[in-house]
Swiss-Prot record:
Belongs to the universal ribosomal protein uS19 family. Keywords: Ribonucleoprotein, Ribosomal protein, RNA-binding, rRNA-binding. The gene is rpsS. It comes from Geotalea daltonii (strain DSM 22248 / JCM 15807 / FRC-32). This is Small ribosomal subunit protein uS19. SUPFAM superfamilies: Ribosomal protein S19. InterPro entries: Ribosomal_uS19, Ribosomal_uS19_bac-type, Ribosomal_uS19_SF.
């Protein structure tokens, strides 16, 4: 279900405070665990280090990202490909 328009986008208070403190001109990376926060127009041009459960993934915010969640740009799972059929590998040799 979508979020109510009257509530507005969710942004963690501590993340918003960090953005206001840094300013738009800062090149400093802002570390965050808040994957659930929505990207607002204030974040454009800033770089965030979003935690994926293991490490921090750098995310540079552009105009196209506004309205999406931080976690969408820091994948949590590593895909190694589907397992190959062992029988077909043995026949080829």
């Amino acid at each position: 279900m979508a979020r109510s328009i009257k509530k507005g986008p969710f942004v963690d208070a501590h993340l918003e405070a960090k953005v206001q403190a840094e300013g738009a001109s800062s090149k400093k990376v802002i570390k965050t665990w808040s994957r659930r926060s929505t990207i607002t127009p204030d974040f454009i041009g800033l770089t965030f280090a979003v935690h994926n459960g293991r490490k921090f993934i750098p995310v540079f915010v552009t105009e196209n990202m506004v309205g999406h969640k931080m976690g969408e740009f820091a994948p949590t799972r590593t895909f190694f490909g589907h397992a190959a059929d062992k029988k077909s590998k043995l026949k080829k040799k």
